[in-house]
C-alpha cells in the first residue's frame, strides 16, 4: 500500500527464512518473548516481508493475517522490521551492517547466562562492505561463539549495482575461514541442503558458523529473477497475476 518495497531481496532469502522458522528454530509463537527461544536477526531488514510471512505461517499473529497492508501509515508491518511494533521481531534492523555484531552480542549473552539457545543472522553480501560486520566476526571468533549461525545471502547484487562492481566479494567464504569461522557453502534454495547445513553447524563446537548461500535475487518469478531493477518496486496488476501463477498462490 505504500507503493514501495523490496520484493527481490525478500524472495532471495525466502527458502532460508522458511526453513529456519518452520523447521530449524526453537521458538514458541504463543510466547514470543520466551527466555530460552532461539533468536533471529534479519540484518538486511529491507527484506522483511518474507519474515512477516514466516511469522504468519508459524502462528505469531491471531487471527492469521490475510492482508499485511505493508508500509501503510499506522500498519504493524512496515518496510523495515521493528521490535517495538511487530510480534516476534527480536531486533529492529534496516541500517545495514549491524546484524552480525548484534547477533554476536546475543550469542555471548547466552554463553554468559549458560543458556542453550542459538542466534541466527541473515545478512546480504553487499552489506559485508560495512566494517562493523567484521568487527562482529572477530569478536565472535575470540569468544568461540559456536551458538551463532550467520547466513550470507550471496546473490551478487546490492541496491544499484552488482556487488563485484562496488567491491569484489567472491571470496566471502574464505574471509570467514580466515577469521576462524566454521564455514559452509550451499545453495540458498535447496531446502534439504539448508536443513543439513544447520544440523552440521549445531553439531560443530568451538567456532561460530557461517553458511554462505548462493541465492537468486527475485527467486521464483520469471520477470524478477536476477533482475536488479526489482531491488525496489511494486508489481503491476498484470505482474501480480503472473506471480500468483508462478508461485502457486491464490492472493
Tell where the protein language model's regions lie, with residue ranges.
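Thiamine diphosphate
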Residues: 88, 92-203
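Structured core elements
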Residues: 41, 149, 185, 210-212
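Glycine/aspartate-rich loop-and-adjacent alpha/beta segment that forms the canonical ThDP
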Residues: 191-251
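Glycine-rich beta-alpha junction loops
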Residues: 15, 46-47, 51, 155-156, ...
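Structural motif
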Residues: 4-11
